[in-house]
């Protein structure tokens, strides 16, 4: 039963992430993200549809029902609160935080959540700049807001310019090699970097180091103008 619950939560969280990135949630995208076969994803989505968690729209996109969105919000809230705890209190290496929080999100109790919002200094966003949703359910002012800034893919031009990193989406943290390159260049949320689009390839420059973003990740970092 626990495996079934964990799978449901992973699917809902993935749909939530895709929406956050501005990507249409399709079964094919879930298959890519979770590295599962098409038939497996279709079977799981069909079960979730029967359970009243998602609806498959006419364009084949997946839409969460109010019940599904409530559950997805709770999972993401636990995940990002765990990231704050692991970073701010425990001091875990930033490159290990996401994977560890993925484990915590399935087992964190409501009571622990309520304690965390009292213990942590900042519960508005994760260490990666992602909004922590559904805080109103824990008695904290609701931080549900549009993602800050602009996607790098929408902002970069052939003319280099300085910007500030404000958000690094979940999927970027999973791409170990690319995330390591970012950390090696000391690029974090709040870093001022130079961005440029060179023949369709976006590069971030910081402290004399360049990071060329993979094409399928250029939409997962958000910036604001200086």
Swiss-Prot record:
Any one GO biological process: negative regulation of DNA-templated transcription
Subcellular compartments: Cytoplasm
Q: What is this protein called?
A: Diphtheria toxin repressor
Mark the transmembrane ranges. Answer: none
Task: Keywords in alphabetical order, please.
Answer: Cytoplasm, DNA-binding, Iron, Repressor, Transcription, Transcription regulation
Q: Which SUPFAM superfamilies match?
A: C-terminal domain of transcriptional repressors, Iron-dependent repressor protein, dimerization domain, Winged helix' DNA-binding domain
What quaternary arrangement does the UniProt entry report? Homodimer.
One of the entry's Gene Ontology molecular-function terms is: transition metal ion binding
Annotated HTH dtxR-type domain ranges read: 4-65
PROSITE patterns, alphabetically? HTH_DTXR
Q: Which organism is it from?
A: Corynebacterium diphtheriae (strain PW8)
Q: Which Pfam families match?
A: DtxR (PF18357), Fe_dep_repr_C (PF02742), Fe_dep_repress (PF01325)
